[in-house]
Amino acid sequence: MKNGLEHNTKLTPEARDKQIADIDKRIDEMAASDPWMKFFLAYAPAPTMRRVKTPVLILTGAHDQQAVPQEVPLMEAAFKEGGNKDVTARVLPDLNHLFVQDTDGFPQNYAKLPPPIMVRADVLEIIVDWLTKRLK
């Protein structure tokens, strides 16, 4: 949510700052009332990534607002720092979190995407090729 607002060019800076402040307040309220949410918000995945020794495929869309592409190099580095020698990372152009063609990737706009809403064929090819090479 917050990332989507921070990159939303349709809002004025004042409106964006107010909505971000409102989200921070809501997140704090959720964390205070829900133990799982508190854990989720505090969880840092890098130590776990460093312990993974199996092959890893990291895929995200360039317009993903949920697993932002800027974090891909950090994830890749964490896996490799732990000694993982088989880490593949790709940021796929023009796609959102669902691997669907999307101009901005904001989840609130998913319902407005024109049909057919399908994972692009090249994404499936990347996954199949990656698996085929490792499951011989």
Model-derived regions: residue spans:
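Short beta-strand/loop motif that positions the catalytic acidic residue
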Residues: 52, 58-60, 64
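Accessory cap/linker subdomain of secreted extracellular hydrolases
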Residues: 1-51
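Acidic beta-to-alpha connecting loop that harbors the catalytic carboxylate
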Residues: 62-64, 93-96
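Catalytic active-site module of serine/aspartate enzymes centered on a nucleophile-bearing elbow/loop
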Residues: 82, 95-99, 104-136
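Conserved alpha/beta-hydrolase "acid-adjacent" motif
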Residues: 65-74
